[in-house]
Amino acid sequence: MKMRPRYSVIASAVSLGFVLSKSVMALGQPDTGSLNRELEQRRIQPEAKPSGELFNQAAKSPYTAQYKQELKFPLTQVQILDRNNQEVVTDELAHILKNYVGKEVSLSDLSNLANEISEFYRNNNYLVAKAILPPQEIEQGTVKILLLKGNVGEIRLQNHSALSNKFVSRLSNTTVNTSEFILKDELEKFALTINDVPGVNAGLQLSAGKKVGEANLLIKINDAKRFSSYVSVDNQGNKYTGRYRLAAGTKVNNLTGWGDELKLDLLSSNQANLKNARIDYSSLIDGYSTRFGVTANYLHYKLGGNFKSLQSQGHSHNLGAYLLHPTIRTPNFRLSTKVSFNHQNLTDEQQAVTVKQKRKINSLTVGIDGSWNLIKDGTTYFSLSTLFGNLANQTNEKKHNAKEDFQPQSHFTVYNYRLSHEQILPKSFAFNIGINGQFADKTLESSQKMLLGGLSGVRGHQAGAASVDEGHLIQTEFKHYLPVFSQSVLVSSLFYDYGFGKYYKNSQSLAQSVKNSVKLQSVGAGLSFSDAGSYAINVSVAKPLDNNIDNADKHQFWLSMIKTF
């Protein structure tokens, strides 16, 4: 008789575990994969904007005295000479010279001709090119013009930072030192890439060289903020591990002098049911600003709420490495290429029913991302990536309890895209619109699924409300910027989000009563009060416009506060 209550408890737990394992989609039970995806949302970095025009070297016409009756003469030939008085082939100037040769010209006309030649070369990448009318005697209508394209003279470095002189030299050797002339695109690329190095501020200064037609380059580098840290709190956590999350982190730049960066982030939920630690170290490895990095991530969780009786918990270890290369750097266009490898060990268990599942995932991702100042006062952002993955799946569940589509080994491919545009409007207004999505070739493990909810998705739903194999998200936002105090900005916004997708790529094993598709949409408003580099307070409220998620909240209130040091 004493054994019956014990048997009843175990039988109930096993029955509950079986029902829950078959109803993950409906109840949305978090696991290591989905929780890692939720944490990835908070690590999304602001997209880098192109800097805009760096050098504006329009040639100015020299002052020429104007007379009522200027002396004119027939121009029969124009000889273009370099700084060594050697004649230069002028085929590329034919469209300019035809407007003067064979006509009567004055000194003012010749001055305009020299200025047009200067403009032509400056518009064709010769940053400091200049055409000059030297003193001369004009014979038989032949005029000589001295063309100085701007040879590279002395390159000097004033380095008052922790950045290595050798690295700066290697970077200059792949840009400004690749030509005998000061080329605008190479100088711009050098300026942009060296200012991309974390922890330094760099400036360039051109001056006249010792020889005729030469320009000296002075590179000034100073330390920016080498050490920084932050603390933050938000309510973006999962209701089963704790809604409120406390995070802290630190970043150190230029530890070795090669533009390296060390980042450490720690996070815990208010109930300590979710703990996460992440470290990321990267360094520049060549004169082309290619960056190599390694990452490590640890997560541990314990579920409460409806899953507390199952004693559900789990942990994951992630190790990764990546290569990031600035493929194109111009003032109005940025393109980066990234190749990354990631190894994941994921473990989930329900101790009450002694069920444990382990997954090992190896993945290789190849992608590009960039931004483009295509429209005046507007920036377009884009990214494309393809992930090739291999999954090794282990479970101690009995065969009749396991999912019908369970496979111990599988390969999968995931395609992601993102396209958005930010447009500045008059009166301190702005409008943002964006679309992003994911395609897959087969049903995915939870760590590879796309989250339709959360702050990076449909903001009227929690992040774990819907995770899909294939999905698409459209977001629009109307903003207003109001300067407050000396350096703070108050941003108010109205937004609309719409997302849709399929829970499973392959739905053959699903019961006919199970709905495989989902659509979410919401509207909301937000306020952000911030001082760049000091603090930020973000508040938003969003209301769902659908009833496609069972037991969904009537609205979502999002709050985050961060203080940087």
UniProtKB/Swiss-Prot annotation:
Main location: membrane
Pfam (any one): POTRA_2
Domain comment as written in the entry: Probably a beta-barrel protein.
InterPro entries, alphabetized: Hemolysn_activator_HlyB_C, Polypept-transport_assoc_ShlB, POTRA, TPS_OM_transporter
Protein name: Heme/hemopexin transporter protein HuxB
Domain POTRA: 73-150
PROSITE patterns: POTRA (PS51779)
GO terms classed as biological process: monoatomic ion transport; protein secretion by the type V secretion system
Keywords: Cell outer membrane, Ion transport, Membrane, Porin, Protein transport, Signal, Transmembrane, Transmembrane beta strand, Transport
A GO CC annotation given for this chain: cell outer membrane
Family classification: Belongs to the TPS (TC 1.B.20) family.
Protein role: Likely functions in the release of soluble HxuA from the cell. Probable member of a two partner secretion pathway (TPS) in which it mediates the secretion of HuxA.
Disulfide cross-links: none
Residues in the signal sequence: 1-26
Gene that specifies this protein: hxuB
Claim: Cytoplasm is one of the keywords in the record: no
Cell compartments where the protein resides: Cell outer membrane
Transmembrane segments: none
Higher taxonomy: Bacteria, Pseudomonadati, Pseudomonadota, Gammaproteobacteria, Pasteurellales
Organism of provenance: Haemophilus influenzae (strain 86-028NP)
